Amino acid sequence: MSDFLWVEKYRPKKISDCILTEDLKNTFSKFLTQKEIPNLLLSGTAGTGKTTVARALCEELGADYIIINGSDEGRHIDTLRTTIKNFASSVSLDGGSNHKVVIVDEADYMNADSVQPALRNFIETFYKNCRFIFTCNFKNKIIPALHSRCTVIDFRITNGQKVKTATAFLKRLGEILKSENIEYDNRVVAELIQRHYPDFRR
């Protein structure tokens, strides 16, 4: 048995490998072609690939990045200020991108009266050297000042897109199970996907 959780072991490293709708994949592919990303607010239910996409963008662009969990260290404004300031204000030596990236995961858990306004200031202060990618389940919990400074991308999957994305995940999960030498019943796996859809982590 591997020591790694499958969600990490098999996390896609490229946008082309992420299970996304065609519109989303095209949007993120354009950023890669331009070799530039704006500040982003990725919104959608849990397990739809927001953090995976954020990491894949950074990896493919060759950008130095850090991940801050908004439900953990992101709740403490002093820690947040120190972490982001130290990272964003330094010049990247190894990265291939023009900008560093701060990924703020679960940003909707951050205090809307103190922490989120501070992030707005960081976006403006470090714009020349750094970009921010925020992920959230509920974009209505993100203050308007952050909305207006980001390109907002909705990961919501419509009923018309459900079959295609669920089928793609069924295929991916089958490949994972085979690589782990685990026997499985395709119908059972399909039922599990249907039960937890669109949360691909469960």
Language model features by range: what are they?
Residues 1-161, 167-168, 187-191:
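P-loop/Walker A NTP-binding region and its immediately flanking N-terminal helices
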Residues 166-189:
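Helix-loop-helix "sensor" segment of P-loop NTPases
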Residues 178, 193-197:
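Alpha-solenoid HEAT/Armadillo repeat architecture
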Residues 184-186, 196-202:
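The conserved phosphate-sensing helix
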